[in-house]
């Protein structure tokens, strides 16, 4: 993908104004309407994985629900949590987003694209196969993604799996943990 010049400039400006350290972990934790397709993954699952794979204490989180950020800060205050998610965001619901004011919709999309760029730049990333942004970044970052709900060596075959099959595999993986 390639951004239009004006969009790229907005993304770059947003990132430049963000005081993120050079070395950091990136992850996406979904809320909102994702529960329609999959059970939402617990914040604790991400915290355990971060502690398992790195000593880094700076974490950028792409999320659509500010409650997740509040929960992370409460559960792991020793970490520095970064996000573009605003305190009024309570999860992405497609039906509501489609009715959002165009200027606010554009702002949220710029934040999303900037978040994707920051996840791609992360020293390492935590992802889930139940999330399209994570799947895209999993392909782009190849070996630099740690899956919270899947074995690393099973990733590429999973790209073509149906939602139902991914859900089943994720549930089986989490039961083994």
Regions flagged by a language model, labelled:
Residues 17, 116, 121-122, 172, ...:
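Low-complexity, intrinsically disordered/propeptide-like segments
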